[in-house]
UniProtKB/Swiss-Prot annotation:
Keywords: Cytoplasm, Phosphoprotein, Repeat, RNA-binding
Protein name: Pumilio domain-containing protein C56F2.08c
Principal cellular location given in the protein's record: cytoplasm
Source species of the chain: Schizosaccharomyces pombe (strain 972 / ATCC 24843) (Fission yeast)
GO molecular function annotations of the record: mRNA 3'-UTR AU-rich region binding
Coiled coil feature spans: none
Pumilio repeat residue numbers: 191-226, 227-263, 264-302, 374-410
One Pfam family hit: PUF
BP GO annotations: nuclear-transcribed mRNA catabolic process, deadenylation-dependent decay
Domain RRM: 1-74
Protein's cellular compartments: Cytoplasm
């Protein structure tokens, strides 16, 4: 029987059955809605153990944290309809101090299964590491099955308190001022032995206890420690008591004192790592050095995933690994455990803190390659997670160990039947953006991009991806779609991509003149309604001759649109359309962009792009002054700003600047 907790709100029994039936025949399922938990009963105990090992602390539900799966057994008064009495604590032996002896705990079983992998990872660090010591620490972590499920509160408050606040304040003042001798301090400490455990968590009492451990002799400190040690973990997580607990550990000097502290803290070490004050108490034990401080690293390896995903636990692990009292073997044990559990730690912000430290600040060799080897089998889950995908991307762009990048890219793009890439691209939240980020990063070799694009195209076609907001950028990058240039105004054909920037500017300017002429100059009867600037014919390559095309700006006879009797304008040079606005033309040819007045004749046998009309003017940026005289024709009048909104901005250069429009 399994007790499943931390389920998403509204989880149905059918979803639980579908999840757990993969590991054996499910007998019964009870949903405990108020607690978001469930009870799953298997026909055989072996199926329950397999399911527990496979699903415990795993994020099996989308957009939800890991679920907790524990073995349970029916209580003595269990009946099929009595759900509240159906489950008792996991099969274990409990004591009155909250310590549970569980030989089949999840941490021990996981550590036992990964024992060989941890030793192999430690060997590949290529450092002076004694693997026999690492193996002995793993065995010790598995054998020490006394694990506390909770930290019981300190001793109950005494009904009659011998020392009041004023008395405690006076004792502390006299000790600080040197008024008491060491013998007098020890006499006071002996008189307070019965209350020393309670005083350790008191606002004033904890400072007095600190003074006792600082000034008393070792026999007196051992006598006080024997009374405090059973409650040292509870004192260590108290906002006042944590200072006394840290002081007690810091001044411990004899083997007996250290052994007492280790004995009573070891079952609570994992819980201390989770606490904001307790994690500092655990770190204080590092000063005991090897082998007395080994229990800290054994607990980290046994509960690596749980501690690494907690806020204070992840930072405590990092601090312990950076401590000078940690040996290479102890560091290798914990770092190897982090690598083995990296696919779970990467989905958590606190776990990512550890992995980032491992990559950026650790001195272990081959760490990038070892991480890549482990994560290569979990790409379908890490690449579809917003946080974990950043770790994969960091490994791909690693320059220290190129093997890690090649391994991840191979498993990402060339998996069997494209299963990994298909799973990633089907995840619309993270997958497509992650793949686009990978193939567009400069460090990816261009020699591989063509193959990557082919694989991505094939997968996108197989999953019937549409060019929507999710897949648009990726499809454009691999060449499945092209950016279409739509005209900004109706009736104006978009210029071809082969037209240079000057031709595109000419098209915009002429189009704006044609469409805005009615509002600027009034209704003109002779103005044609055809597009002012037709697009370049795509079937005619540049540099070749073509037949005259009616209405095409690129090649048209000069005399096609010239009306008889129309005043002739000097067009020896191409006229700036801004200046041509004020020319004396009749309605039949006034500002008609199709007119030959604004075209240059094309020599036979050669097709050229239109030159953008220009004029050179010396501008005088003085209010009310003339804005320059054109040098092309003396017949053309002067031009003032404001005539054409589209061209008005170009008539305001900086003072003394030569402007070429």
């Amino acid at each position: 029987m399994l007790y499943v907790s931390n389920l998403p709100v509204g989880t149905s029994s059918s979803a639980i059955h579908a999840l757990f039936s993969a590991y054996g025949n499910v007998k019964d399922i009870w949903m405990l809605s108020p607690d978001n938990s469930a009870i799953v009963s298997y026909e055989s105990l072996s199926s329950a153990i397999v399911a527990r090992d496979a699903l415990h602390n795993r994020p099996v539900f989308e957009n939800h944290g890991p679920v907790q799966v524990m073995l349970a057994k029916p209580s003595s008064n269990y009946e099929p309809g009595n759900i509240t009495a159906a489950v008792s604590p996991p099969a274990s032996t409990s004591s009155k101090d909250g310590v549970v002896c569980s030989p089949t705990s999840t941490g021990a079983s996981q550590l036992l299964k990964s024992r060989v992998d941890i030793l192999e990872v430690a060997r590949q660090f290529e450092m002076r590491i004694n693997l026999d010591i690492v193996d002995s620490m793993i065995a010790s972590a598995i054998e020490n099955n006394k694990v506390a499920t909770e930290i019981l509160p300190p001793v109950e408050t005494l009904r009659s308190r011998q020392f009041e606040a004023s008395k405690l304040r006076e004792i502390r003042k006299n000790i600080d001022s040197g008024f008491y001798t060491q013998e007098e301090i020890e006499v006071i400490a002996r008189s307070m032995l019965d209350d020393v455990a309670e005083l350790s968590s008191d606002y004033l009492g904890n400072t007095v206890v600190q003074k006792f451990f600082e000034y008393c002799s070792d026999p007196i400190k051992e006598a006080m420690l024997e009374r405090i040690a059973p409650y040292l973990a509870a004192i260590g997580i108290h906002k006042n008591g944590t200072w006394a607990a840290q002081k007690i550990i810091d001044v411990a000097s004899t083997e007996k004192q250290m052994d007492l502290i280790v004995k009573h803290l070891r079952p609570y070490t994992a819980l201390l790592y989770f606490d904001q004050f307790g994690n500092y108490v655990a770190q204080c034990c590092l000063r005991f050095k090897y082998p007395k401080n080994t229990f800290l690293f054994e607990v980290m390896a046994r509960h690596c995933c749980e501690i690494g995903q907690s806020r204070f636990g992840a930072r405590a692990i990092r601090a312990c690994l950076e401590n000078e009292n940690a040996t290479f073997e102890q560091q290798a044990l914990v770092v190897a455990s982090i690598i083995i559990n990296s696919h779970l730690l990467a989905t958590n912000s606190n776990g990512m803190l550890l992995l980032t430290w491992l990559l950026d600040n650790s001195f272990f060799r081959n760490r990038h390659r070892l991480l890549a080897i482990h994560l290569a089998t979990h790409l379908h889950t890490t690449c579809t997670h917003k946080l974990a995908s950043t770790l994969i991307f960091k490994l791909i762009n690693n320059k220290q160990e190129p093997e890690s990048r090649n391994l991840l890219l191979k498993n990402l793009f060339f998996s069997e039947k494209d299963n990994v890439l298909t799973y990633i691209l089907q995840d619309q939240a993270v997958g497509p953006s992650f793949i686009h980020k990978v193939i567009t990063y400069p460090s990816i070799g261009r020699e591989f991009l063509a193959q990557f694009h082919l694989v991505i195209k094939r997968v996108l076609i197989n999953i019937h991806a549409q060019p929507n907001a999710v897949y648009c950028r990726l499809m454009e990058e691999v060449g499945m779609t092209s950016k279409s240039i739509s005209p900004s105004l109706s009736g104006i054909s978009a210029p071809s991509a082969s037209v240079d920037s000057s031709a595109s500017r000419l098209a915009r300017d002429f189009g704006s003149l044609s469409l805005s002429s009615n509002s600027l100059l009034g209704s003109l009867g002779g103005l044609e309604s055809t597009p002012a600037y037709p697009s370049y014919p795509s079937h005619i390559p540049l540099g070749t001759a073509s037949l005259p095309l009616k209405g095409n700006l690129y090649q048209i006879s000069r005399s096609d649109d010239i009306k008889s009797g129309a005043p002739v304008l000097d067009t020896s040079s191409l006229v700036n359309p801004t200046l041509a606005k004020s020319a004396s033309l009749n309605n039949s040819s006034l500002l008609n962009p199709s007119s030959s007045l604004l075209r240059r004749e094309v020599p036979a046998g050669k097709l050229t792009m239109p030159a953008y009309p220009y004029t050179t003017q010396l501008m005088n940026h003085t209010a009310g002054a003339d804005y320059g005289l054109p040098r092309l024709s003396s017949k053309l009048p002067q031009v003032f700003p404001g005539n054409y909104p589209r061209l008005q901005q170009s008539l305001f250069p900086r003072q003394g600047e030569l402007r070429f429009n």
